[in-house]
């Protein structure tokens, strides 16, 4: 039985079992499974207790006994050595080196616990270095837990991250925070550097909002600088705005920016040649790995020096390092203006990598995710050019709206697929670095189980059912019901390989 990997080849892969009609209710086999499971599977709202972001979410005694200090430093790790999985005869797989686990907030925190306890720990003997990035604990540690987590990823090489809250004014008031802390993703990216790559999870049974997209579109987002490290301020009244650069061994150079006649706003931002070069190398390497052409897009016609620097560095590195490899694989690299590239992207069938600046990549990755069917079907990985650090997470947020429903005791149907893939992509990287193919195979089998439950059995969460045009209640299941189906499918797939 072959494993599933998500690349250009996956988009062309045909499944052996035909997908059910999109307008039909769940298949009879799916209904039988859910009916037989109803005595043990309840809605997520009744099965998982609401927890404060400050508390650990693991149901295991190991996690519940951790101290606050251990949550911060990650020194207290999971060392589970049971020889068999629950209710199965499948041997546990040893993960050679640790994986850094970054917990998160709200609905995704609850789902994260379920994934860890039901789909990861029963099958893997893994040392998890745990850091609680829940908003309240970040506030308690003055956000040092985020810095420590990033340093741990540097040390161990691989991290998996749950979605987290980036506070705004309303969140500061809600959580009574000391201050409006920065985005933990931004903090981690600025410490690790590298490039964020977002790739769709393609499920043939889920129709695309952009129907022509038959091949993956991978967004490479430069994970450093620009607006995300900008200094901005409100200008209170008339005055002169200037930009001053002072060389280490030279006289200050002053550039006039604007003469304000009244109030306004101003912003300065920056990037570095070193970071742009790393971005270029990571982008070219990803394109070669996936066997796809690469497009780099900027607005260099307007930002002639700023965006022009990106364009020039990419071209220089392509010609000096990667052109021969691209041509040997019949691939190409091209710079295109961002507005032209976005228009061409919508008209295309997919099948390429886009290298984008920080803000452009942030926006376009969500557009691509929704175009392929759902924000819940998009992976996000942070990759450094030399491969010394790798972090994977879901591309979506903490699903606050579902969490509010959960707090009221109502059932929720939150798509966990991207969060599951955050674990699997991290495990695949860990297995590759450690040269442990059984770890890679397990992660690929878990990904395959997620896809097959939707594609072959018609069991899906509400967002995917709506994408299929199915609004009736019987068309979708709760989060825990979906994950129970994935667990069943995973066990069957693993047993068939023994």
UniProtKB/Swiss-Prot annotation:
NCBIfam families, sorted: nadp_idh_euk, PRK08299.1
Cystine connections: none
Cofactor(s) the protein needs: Mg(2+); Mn(2+)
Localization per record: Mitochondrion
Amino acids binding NADP(+): 164-166, 171, 347, 397-402, 415
PANTHER family xrefs: ISOCITRATE DEHYDROGENASE [NADP], MITOCHONDRIAL (PTHR11822:SF21), NADP-SPECIFIC ISOCITRATE DEHYDROGENASE (PTHR11822)
GO cellular component terms listed in the entry, alphabetical order: mitochondrion
Record Gene3D superfamilies: Isopropylmalate Dehydrogenase
Source organism per UniProt: Aspergillus niger
Catalyzed chemical reaction(s): D-threo-isocitrate + NADP(+) = 2-oxoglutarate + CO2 + NADPH
Pfam families noted in UniProt: Iso_dh
Chain residues that bind Mn(2+): 339, 362
GO biological process, one term: tricarboxylic acid cycle
Alphabetical UniProt keywords: Glyoxylate bypass, Magnesium, Manganese, Metal-binding, Mitochondrion, NADP, Oxidoreductase, Transit peptide, Tricarboxylic acid cycle
Site (Critical for catalysis): 228, 299
GO molecular function, one term: isocitrate dehydrogenase (NADP+) activity
Record's protein name: Isocitrate dehydrogenase [NADP], mitochondrial
Secretion signal span: none
Enzyme Commission number(s): 1.1.1.42
Residues bound to substrate: 166, 183-189, 198, 221
Biological classification of the source: Eukaryota, Fungi, Dikarya, Ascomycota, Pezizomycotina
Co-factor binding comment: Binds 1 Mg(2+) or Mn(2+) ion per subunit.
